[in-house]
Amino acid sequence: MEPTISNRSVKKTLLHKGGFANAKIYRLETPDGEVFIEKDFSGCSFLIRNTIGRFLIRREVHYLLRLEETGIVPGKARRIGPFCMRETFCDGQTLREIPKPNPKVPGSENRIPVAYFHTLFNALQNIHQSGIVHLDLHNLRNIIVSADGTPVLLDWQSAIHTRLLLPPIRRLLENIDNMGVLKAFDKFHPEAMNDELSKKLEHAKKIRRRFWLPRIHLTRKDAKK
């Protein structure tokens, strides 16, 4: 049986108030120092929480558990009822929060080592080989540089299995993931993009233009955060 957390013994902080079809997001801190993120659709309308809410909670927990051993996703994911889930809080910064280095600005040194992006890209290829794509890695809020410098990928609600898809479709979806990561690599370390990675990025861009694949956003309000 999964361990439970007493509501009377936990410090609960609202991080995101949610919206029409978005979960409220909380930070939970237990007396023994464990920290979790909680996503809760309970505050949405009856229709939303019983359709989108149930579906997304079940979906995200499924992929987090499937990939937990890779070390690139938050651990201890579990459902807390039909509309709510918890996962371990990942201490660190998202790639969106880290400023792009500017050689013209004193003190604007690159804070992310090249090795981080190689680790991230290789881990993503392993995930693809296991038959899973993320599909929202253009959103740099979903890519974390953890406190120990390792990559962590968040928000698996858009993910899908690719085992049963036709090879051209599978490669198309994998290219969507690859482009998100390689664009971030090119943003922070353009000098480290070798010919192979540069070709992969250009290929992914061509595929995107050909099929007009728009970037995935939850809401306009979220995109501005």
Language-model features: locations:
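Juxta-kinase regulatory segment immediately upstream of eukaryotic protein kinase catalytic domains
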Residues: 1-16, 211-212, 222-224
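ATP-binding glycine-rich loop module of kinase domains
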Residues: 11-65
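Conserved structural core of kinase catalytic domains
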Residues: 53, 65-68, 72-118
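Conserved hydrophobic alpha-helix
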Residues: 120-127, 134
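Catalytic-loop of the protein kinase fold
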Residues: 129-145
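C-lobe/activation-segment region of protein kinase-like
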Residues: 146-225
